[in-house]
Amino acid sequence: MQQFEHPHIIRLIGVCSESPIWIVMELARLGEMRAYLQSNASRLDLATLLLFSFQLSTALSYLESKKFVHRDIAARNVLVSTPHVVKLADFGLSRVLDNQSYYKSSKGKLPIKWMAPESINFRRFTTASDVWMFGNFIFFKTNLY
């Protein structure tokens, strides 16, 4: 994650590896998107929601260019920096694709609510499954509007 430089991906500043381990990241003052949407629904217009969607789509395009799959695109993992800027965060499930077209997860809990059918059924993750999750994110976000 430290290698990512994109205006809509939260920046990793550093890691303190001595116990307790600390991850130092860029501050997104307005918190996670889910809570922000719920508390500001009456003040948000469609243009702002579309702007948020566009910003997140550029972050996903950037990740695809780096051969990464995020695997957890959800409102809880999008942070609001300012009233007009969102950033993708929480790369705990993300994986590099290397020379393969997909990543196969062998074990562990996954966020089924947002996942693509092939990810649920076969535990296969591609950039297309990230796009599916992005679509679910847009659906969630616009239903609050």
Language model feature labels by segment:
Residues 1-145:
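Intracellular eukaryotic protein kinase-like catalytic domain
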